Design a protein with these regions (language model features):
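Catalytic-site microenvironment of enzymes
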Residues: 1-249
Length: 249
């Protein structure tokens, strides 16, 4: 956290520069003081944004329904992956990025709720979704890292529901997030994938995206995802994507 705090002002300044460089500045993002100095506004003021850092220290192999109307079940919380070289568990990286994201969103004026702020918890995927539904979130990001037996595979990807009331809104949010991660974090990107197999997405009653930040099974992305500066870039890019989403007609 100390490393993040030392770089936080730089992140905010970078966001301000990104806004000022845009051909059409995002509504409410930049304002000017009386002496003409550029200042950062709060473009996400009034929004309630949920963050669900994926996984937890210990998996929960008990079963729960993957959707409200389904008899199919999955483990309440899977174990997640780990860095191929760093051996850092996914749940650690998920939380690190989520905490940075929380702080930037708060600075942007959003009200933020996290499903967890520590790793040693036991919160099922249904419980995480219901928590956000009951809180009245305007949108939810589920922060994860990917893994593959093919260590050459890399790239950030977004997962949303294929069907359901929030499917298209979630897909629109996902497209904005994916574009921003590629442009502002410099990440290699994959695509927006539509699935009805993710419990946390199926139980969500608001626009919800499962964000796969990259592949911990890939040596290059393992190193990046464990780098504090890159984590800040990813978090900042996700914020930019959310701002783009809320300003899209």
């Amino acid at each position: 956290m100390r490393r993040f705090l030392t770089g936080f002002l730089c992140v905010i300044l970078a966001l301000g520069m990104a806004f000022s460089a845009a051909a059409e500045p995002v509504r409410g993002a930049v304002r000017f003081s009386e002496d003409g100095q550029e200042q950062l506004g709060q473009p996400l003021a009034g929004l309630k944004i949920g963050i669900d850092p994926g996984h937890q220290t210990h998996a929960n192999t008990e079963r729960e329904a993957i959707a409200p109307d389904s008899s199919e079940t999955k483990a309440k919380v899977a174990s997640g992956t780990a860095g191929v070289n760093t051996r850092t568990p996914e749940y650690v990286v998920d939380l690190q990025v989520s905490l940075i994201l929380r702080d930037i969103l708060t600075a942007m004026g959003a009200e933020v709720k996290m499903t967890r702020e520590e790793n040693d918890v036991d919160i099922s995927n249904i419980e995480r979704a219901v928590m956000m539904n009951e809180w009245g979130a305007d949108m939810v990001l589920r922060i994860h890292c990917n893994g593959s037996i093919d260590r050459s595979v890399k790239g950030a990807g977004m997962y949303v529901r294929k069907t359901g009331a929030m499917a298209e809104e979630s897909a629109q949010l996902a497209r904005c997030l994916l574009a921003a991660v590629g442009e502002y974090a410099g990440a290699q990107t994959q695509s927006v994938y539509k699935r009805d197999t993710y419990t946390g997405l199926n139980w969500s009653e608001v626009p919800c995206v499962l964000v796969e930040l990259g592949y911990l099974s890939n040596a290059e992305e393992d190193a990046l995802l464990n780098d504090a500066a890159y984590q800040e870039k990813l978090a900042l890019a996700l914020v930019w994507g959310m701002i783009d989403y809320v300003n899209t007609p």
